[in-house]
Amino acid sequence: MTEAMKITLSTQPADARWGEKATYSINNDGITLHLNGADDLGLIQRAARKIDGLGIKHVQLSGEGWDADRCWAFWQGYKAPKGTRKVEWPDLDDAQRQELDNRLMIIDWVRDTINAPAEELGPSQLAQRAVDLISNVAGDRVTYRITKGEDLREQGYMGLHTVGRGSERSPVLLALDYNPTGDKEAPVYACLVGKGITFDSGGYSIKQTAFMDSMKSDMGGAATVTGALAFAITRGLNKRVKLFLCCADNLISGNAFKLGDIITYRNGKKVEVMNTDAEGRLVLADGLIDASAQKPEMIIDAATLTGAAKTALGNDYHALFSFDDALAGRLLASASQENEPFWRLPLAEFHRSQLPSNFAELNNTGSAAYPAGASTAAGFLSHFVENYQQGWLHIDCSATYRKAPVEQWSAGATGLGVRTIANLLTA
């Protein structure tokens, strides 16, 4: 490994020879980042991306001004899927160093898991990785159950079984219980539900290549809520939380589900399948039914659910939906505290009725007459939340993954959302 490039911070502008827009300058001592007080964390992250682009793979964050948030901003921009990078961190106090180390361990796990090829990460592997991560930080405070394949059908998890049955890799439901109280009768404070589609071809409503080539990342919601629970535990979460991951491949085969199929759920709802590429809501429904049965104060589901959310927000914000204004406000406050981007999109009672079917209570996709795709998807999910008007948040994870690099991020997963959900759980 070459000698480390020193990276220092300055509140003074760069020498005029670097140009009036210069955010960093280079001299014999290393690289100086010139902070302007307007968006220092963003500036550090963008500069780190440029430094990585120069091929510099070993750096030392040196001098005054570095704290955990600034170190983390640098790492978010510096990390990329290919190659090895080494950072020598500055001296931080014990609390800040522990916070940074936990982010590096858990959010890097989220990014690396989302970036993993689908060939390496099937439904069972995703569930087991989640168990391993949370067990590592929680120890014997965790119990879990994994249900897969035909056992899902026999136990009534018809959405998950239907979507996953077309793959040779069995669909899996992970039900994990983090209970720090030691009391088996302790109330459940929150339930987290994640969409874990480890590859999404679209099924018989097949995707074009340009829309399928990033679908190893369609389990981003599951990775995000797993990371959020693990991170909340490192921050001292002392309440009981349950995690439900709905994991499957959505593939084409002689046994795959088809348009016109009708799924009957355990809560009695019948759903007509009119788009096999709207599979995420079908698997989440099973997880939300289980979550509702726990009678928690709060249910949070996370899913890379719709292209409509990305159309509205790009990859820059996660989309938030809720009927509960107070709870939505709490999550947005958590996002602000953690410097993570969330934006609330509309969800109203009428969205719940914009999925009409001639053969069932619900259609799994909106018609051309109801084009608000992200809102109608949230409306669909609300039918599987017992008390949907209070205590439920739906996150459409549009900021989870980038197909191409931008000035702040490499291509691939971002890890955004983990800290916000953890903040809300521990508030």
From Swiss-Prot:
Q: Entry's SUPFAM superfamilies? A: Zn-dependent exopeptidases
Entry's localization field: Cytoplasm
| Record keyword Cytoplasm present | yes
The UniProt entry annotates the active site at K207, R281
Q: Which reaction does it catalyse?
A: Release of an N-terminal amino acid, Xaa, from a peptide or arylamide. Xaa is preferably Glu or Asp but may be other amino acids, including Leu, Met, His, Cys and Gln
GO terms in the biological process aspect are:
proteolysis
Gene Ontology, cellular component aspect: cytoplasm
Instruction: Give the UniProt keywords, A-Z.
Output: Aminopeptidase, Cytoplasm, Hydrolase, Manganese, Metal-binding, Protease
Positions that bind Mn(2+) 1: D200, D277, E279
Location, primary (coarse class): cytoplasm
Give the Gene3D superfamilies listed for this entry. Zn peptidases (3.40.630.10)
Give coiled-coil spans as residue ranges.
Answer: none
Q: Which residues are listed as membrane-spanning?
A: none
> Which InterPro entries does this entry report, sorted A to Z?
Leucine_aapep/pepB, M17_PepB-like_N, Pept_M17_PepB, Peptidase_M17_C
User: Which residues are involved in binding Mn(2+) 2?
Assistant: K195, D200, D218, E279
CDD domains of this UniProt entry? Peptidase_M17
Look up the record and name the cofactor or cofactors this protein needs.
Mn(2+)
Q: Name one GO molecular function term.
A: manganese ion binding
Cofactor binding comment, as recorded: Binds 2 manganese ions per subunit.
- Record's PANTHER family? LEUCINE AMINOPEPTIDASE-RELATED, PEPTIDASE B
Annotated NCBIfam families: PRK05015.1
What is its quaternary makeup?
A: Homohexamer.
Purpose: Probably plays an important role in intracellular peptide degradation.
Q: Which HAMAP family match?
A: Aminopeptidase_M17
Q: What is this protein called?
A: Peptidase B
